[in-house]
Amino acid sequence: VAVMGGEPEAMFRRAISELGGMKQFVKPGQKVVVKPNIGWDKVPELAGNTNPQLIAEIVKQCFAAGAKEVTVFDHTCDDWQKCYKNSGIEAAAKAAGAKVMPAHLESYSKPVNLPNGQKMKKAKIHEAILNCDVWINVPILKNHGGANLTISMKNHMGIVWDRGFFHQNDLQQCIADICTLQKKAVLNVVDAYRIMKTNGPRGRSASDVVLAKGLFISPDIVAVDTAAAKFFNQVREMPLDTVGHLAKGEALKIGTMNIDKLNVKRIKM
């Protein structure tokens, strides 16, 4: 589902209703993780991190569907306490009733095998992901210096302890490899309310940001990232073959890039 032209909460409410409501993905009594991008010490207007209003709405919907608890975390790049605070996500998540958990220590992560990985055969994954019943992946759509675009697949780097391995060993392949994790997100929600078009993933100034008012959601991670990447191309040219992890993900059978054959609902608000 692709929604355009609304505020983050309203777009998500519309999108999730098109997929049959959050109860399709979250069952009563479940422990849920909502995994935003909180990587950077940036305010929401600079589009470095997932929109906090969107995160709050998703958390509320999880509880409305009967979730027992909802946990929010990310393995940040900048100082984690500053990221959690200045992104607005910690306050928004807590106000909606979620627990907010850190990820800055290796002890939070446990080793997991990735038998289908090509370059990466194992990774240390955050215990919140390993211990939850279901998780929801909520990236922001951004330009990225290394991966060209960072969306849902790339957002998996925030559940992993050793990010350095990715950058030293074929980043695009490792992004696809981590998405072969057996415990896949039940839903991917791409925040394209504000898009960082240049100088990502950190960004330099407000001139890097475009108010695009988009949202994409799907259980298929490759499809949702392909749709978001095509949307990014309306703002700045970025051939999909330069975002190599999409095709590599399709090759590993974690989703499809052929979004024309899917029933994509496009909604203007």
Stretch-by-stretch model annotation:
Residues V1-M269:
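N-terminal and secondary-structure boundary signal
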